Amino acid sequence: MSDSYSRPIIAFMSDLGTTDDSVAQCKGLMMSICQDVTVVDVCHSMEPWNVEEGARYIVDLPRFFPEGTVFATTTYPATGTTARSVAVRIKYPAKGGARGQWAGSGEGFERSEGSYIYIAPNNGLLTTVLQEHGYTEAYEVSSTDVVPARPEPTFYSREMVAIPSAHLAAGYPLEKVGRKLQDSEIVRFTPPQATVSPEGDLSGVVTAIDHPFGNIWTSIHRDNLESAGVGYGTNLKIVLDDVFPFELPLSPTFADAGEVGDPVVYVNSRGYLSLARNAASLAYPYNLKEGMSVRVTRS
């Protein structure tokens, strides 16, 4: 993709919900500051204050959005404190999905280096973004050109993320939003890991339940599968928490399971090993949850 979209875009992700006017206030200010902006709602129903969940929803976005998009992403438990947001320009958008490719028709739309900005609380929300895409520059968001001189203390998602994101979308220089941050100043959490043994056995954890479908997502990435010599058609034994065993071939999609309700193991659209039932929930009937251990061997 060689050109930015002709209008500014803000992709907005928050934990604000949609049962009141909070999101509308943020979007109204975005459109007041950058009057020709297109605001895309990514998600506003994540679990409040769950930084790791929020990180999962924002890491894949660059390969779906036009170059020049500003990603305004927020869950702000430190609202009202001296905490400030961080704005980063990512280095090079990573390919993704089950097949490690660009999104779009044909071969998809390749992205350019340095073509996206994220703004978020400096609380770890950008951990996986920085891990997957890298970054070229990062700044504390503190200039009163882009944030209120006296921010509303109970609504930093609006004051410290939504408002400055609109200024950035309108062309305000990233390097002027505040002081440049050292890498050590950017807060990160430790993402769930996966390991591959010399024998090709894999281990990880359940990272998410894919609501509302009840599919099980794990921390085992397609790269881990390739390292273990696992591909589509490989017969696998998968054990969750040493209790729930499954013996299935790795399949490209749900319909390969056969009948409705039959189990299937696949690589999800984010590139991670997952378990499901064809057109039925796996997690809810069996009370499967995030954090359960996952062990994978060839059967």
From Swiss-Prot:
Instruction: Spell out the InterPro entries in the cross-references.
Output: Fluorinase, SAM_HAT_C, SAM_HAT_N, SAM_OH_AdoTrfase, SAM_OH_AdoTrfase_C_sf, SAM_OH_AdoTrfase_N_sf
Check the record and name the SUPFAM superfamilies matching this protein: Bacterial fluorinating enzyme, C-terminal domain, Bacterial fluorinating enzyme, N-terminal domain
Q: Which key words tag this protein in UniProt?
A: S-adenosyl-L-methionine, Transferase
Q: Where, in this chain's numbering, is S-adenosyl-L-methionine bound?
A: 15, 20-22, 76, 157, 210, 215, 269-270, 277-279
The answer to whether keyword Oxidoreductase applies is no
Question: Is Transferase among the key words of this record?
Answer: yes
Q: How is its activity regulated?
A: Activity is not severely affected by most metal ions (Mg(2+), Mn(2+), Co(2+) and Fe(2+)), but both Cu(2+) and Zn(2+) are strong inhibitors.
Q: Which PANTHER family match?
A: CHLORINASE MJ1651
Query: What name goes with this protein?
Result: Fluorinase
